[in-house]
Design a protein with these regions (language model features):
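C-terminal substrate-binding/cap subdomain adjacent to the FAD-binding core in PCMH-type
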Residues: 1-123
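Conserved glycine-rich FAD pyrophosphate-binding loop
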Residues: 68, 72-75, 98-280
Length: 280
């Protein structure tokens, strides 16, 4: 469950044991497994080989990933995927042992490390993830909170969504979660909406043709879109109530509401100084 996942991720983060720490809930995990094609898998495997200077080790990794395919995730619910870097093999081994101990203590069990190896070998992949596997509109939001508040925040998010579950089901809107950490002091929860709605020109421009030709072309769906937007803004309010912050000033989030009056006055004074005529 997410309590066990968060426990492990926070412990690993607070001890600064890894460079990348990413978790998925069951829904988003399933989406991730659906999304990629065989040709994409082969490209990723090629990246694993190219990204490893030790050809023997690279071939071993590639064979393990190919043999495990996607079956290794079949019975997995919540998962965490980790990448760590150290100056020596000895220190790396020590960190790996400690990471495994923390995960085992939280009730986890080890799976094939395909996702970290592929992420490491292919850091700049095409932006095909900006639509769902069937062509759904992808709408993520996020909140950053202290580690100590992560579990309670997740429970409150789930409670809010549960109140609207009938409407979500009726409109075939899926909600998944991505989790990550920021150094040893921040925990990121990212709810991701997959809405059966039309996509924009930017999606058609950015997503690869091989992906676009295999998706459904959803018609404009203002009801589903409206429900998604309503829930997003309800979640924004919840994030502010629990003391969360975000990384996207000027976008959907209410920057002003998250500041006390003194901080807002500082911002206004700076704005007046650099833009006295209000041109920006």
């Amino acid at each position: 469950d997410f309590d066990s996942l968060f426990k492990a991720m926070s412990k690993i983060s607070k001890n600064e044991l890894v460079d990348v720490c990413v978790g998925f809930d069951p829904y988003l995990q399933n989406i991730r497994m659906q999304r990629e094609s065989l040709s994409s898998d082969l490209k990723n495997l090629a990246g694993v080989i190219k990204g490893n200077k030790n050809r023997v080790s690279a071939m071993k990794d590639t064979v393990k990933i190919a043999l495990s395919g996607r079956r290794y995730m079949d019975n997995v619910e919540y998962s965490v995927h980790l990448i760590l870097e150290e100056k020596t093999q000895e220190s790396a081994t020590t960190s790996i042992v400690e990471v495994k101990r923390i995960c085992n203590h939280a009730g986890g069990s080890e799976i094939e490390s395909s996702i970290p190896k592929i992420l490491r070998a292919n850091p700049f992949t095409p932006l095909n993830n900006i639509i769902g596997p069937r062509g759904e509109r992808w709408m993520p939001i996020h909140v950053i909170i202290p580690h100590s508040k992560a579990n309670q925040a997740m429970r409150e998010i789930q409670q809010l969504l549960a109140k609207h579950q009938d409407k979500l089901d009726k409109n075939k809107i899926g909600v998944g979660f991505l989790y990550t950490v920021i150094s040893n002091n921040g925990f990121v929860i990212e709810p991701v909406f997959f809405t059966p709605d039309s996509i924009d020109e930017i999606h058609k421009e950015v997503v690869e043709d091989g992906i676009l030709k295999n998706i459904e072309c959803f018609e404009d769906n203002p009801v589903a879109r409206g429900l998604t937007n309503t829930l997003r803004y309800e979640l924004f309010d919840l994030f502010e109530d629990i003391g969360g912050v975000h990384m996207q000033i000027g976008k959907s989030y209410n920057f002003r509401k998250g500041l006390n009056i003194e901080s807002w006055n500082v911002i206004e004074n700076i704005k007046h100084t650099v833009d006295p005529n209000g041109l920006i």
